[in-house]
Structures are given as structure tokens and as C-alpha cells.
Amino acid sequence: MNNILKYTNKQLQDILAENKFKKFNADQIFEWIYTKNELDFSKMTNLSLDLRKYLSENFNTDLLEELVCQESNDGTVKFLFKLCDNRSIETVLMPQSYGQSVCVTTQVGCNMGCTFCASGIIKKIRNLEVDEIIAQVYYVNRFLKNKYPNDTTGRNRVSHIVVMGIGEPLDNYENTLDFINILNSPKAFGIGARHITVSTCGLVPKIKAFADLQLQANLAISLHAPNDEIRNQIMPINKAFPLVKLMEAVDYYIEKTNRRITFEYILIDKVNDSVENAHQLAALIKGKNAYVNLIPYNEVHENPFRKSTNIDNFFKALKSKKINCIVRKEFGADIDAACGQLRAIREGILK
């Protein structure tokens, strides 16, 4: 039995039409699910009894099971969820000045093998289904509505999505696209495409395919190194798609979409954080419609990497080369909020 959360509005319309129901019923169902937060088909009273019976017999509306909910002093909330096959995934709520941002997971584990990342310690087991990605947002939305029941400032709903959790989103390409479709649909969450950011470590063919769609969603490149020598050491994907190929894909994306791109750069002590590295990075991305998001490293005991003590100098070196850059705020340092960290600790892989 399929979860109804996996379907876009168009897909649900087609299913209903094939079964002799009206296409407009899909809009009614979406309104119940996403506007009224009702998942019980029997309570969808403007649907015919026959349709409610059909839905109950052919679809489920199961959400994720919360295993852990950790709330940080800075307001960050990290959830560990159990899936139907007893695997676990993480989702993070990050309150921002501009709204409520949620970081979602797209895979159980990750095969990209980035040596500094807690996610990569657990290899990819499977892709998440669309409903499993959607359910993360749905669950956090419910959490916010319960936390701020009478709020009128927007704090009680998810407004921004970053697809930067466990896994490589473009390695789960079709499901990620359907997820974005549902997020963006005014009949569902109604989250504007420019409030959605998809991150990739550099799957060049998928970056180009994503560019061809000309979506208004944001693209972030997990770069983390200014040259092939360093990137080969910490990101195995670079051996398949070295920086010259990655930068060609970036240029293609910018040309096709006319959208600014983000380069994410985790600063790791004595690995990629020297002033010389900053100058190399500036030369690599000079002239591109882009900015750099400098990220303090969140340490994992099981690997030798440590947080850089040279962040300020690196930032100033980029600025001196006229590179747009920011240092990202650290979220949830007191609650194991690094990507994959909570899950790995619970499963006994990290200490």
C-alpha cells in the first residue's frame, strides 16, 4: 500500500482519473492533508463515500516515528526518525530571522565517502521515497503548529528548506524533484522555489540536468577544497568529476538559470584553511555569479579532523580578493547537530 504523501498533485489527479474519480478531487485531498493537516481519510467530509473508501483501501498516511528530539540552547531542534524498515534518519529545524528553515535527509546513509563527514561513516543503504522526505517537513510543520498555536508571525510553519541532510540529493534525483514539486505547489506546502536549496557534492551530469529544468530553486555546491590535490583526499567524488569538470557544470548552471550559486566550504584545521588556500579558492571561482558559505567544522571523534582556528584570516583573504562570502552561524553544537552525527551515535558508530 503506497503512502499518499509520495504523490504530486498531477500524479494523484492521474491516479484518480484512472479509477473513475474526478481530477479536482486531488485538490480537495491536498487541501485536507496540507492545509487542514488531516490525514484521516474518513474525516475528509467533502469527498464522496466511495472515494473515501477507495483511499482507505489503497493508500496509507503513515508518518515517521520520532525516536529522539533534541532542542539546543540556540533554538535548533534535531529529530531522529524511524522508518518503516526500522532504519533511522535525521531532520533539523533551524530557526532563522527570516523564518523556520528545515534541513531534510534524502538517503539512508551516503556513498559519497567524504572523509570529514559523519554521514559517510554509514554507507548508503537505500534512497528515501518521496513520502519519507515529505513526511520530515510535514512532521516539523506539526511540531511548530503545536509549539506556537496562536502565532501570527510565521513561526508556526516551515518557510525554507535546505536539502543538505544525510545523503546526496542528486543521487536520489527523481524523488528529490518530486519532493521539490510538492513543496513548491500552492496546493501543498506552498514554499517558494527560491526558499528551497539543494546541495550536491558535485555529480556533474545531474547538475547539468538540474540546470536544464530551469527551476528557481537554489543550488549549493559542497566544494570544501580549492584544488584537486586537497579535494581528492577528502572528497572521493572529485576523482570522477575533478574541479575543471565541476566548474564547467557550475558555469552551465549559471548560464541556463541566471541564478547565483553557493559554494559551501567547511574549514578544517591545517587541511584547507590557509590564506594560500583562500587565494586559490578566489582564483577558482573568480568572475562567477556566486558566493562562498564558510562553515566551521563540527568535529567527529572518529576522524582526525579538527575545527579551523584560521576562519577569520581565511574570510579576510577572500574579501581581499573581492569574493562574496559569509561565515555560517553554527547550529546546535550542544545537541550533535552535525549531519549524520545523532544517528551514528545512537547506532553505536560514533561515541
Located regions from the model:
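Canonical Radical SAM [4Fe-4S] cluster-binding loop centered on the CxxxCxxC motif
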Residues: 95-144
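Conserved AdoMet/S-adenosylmethionine-binding subsite of the radical SAM
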Residues: 145-151, 157-325
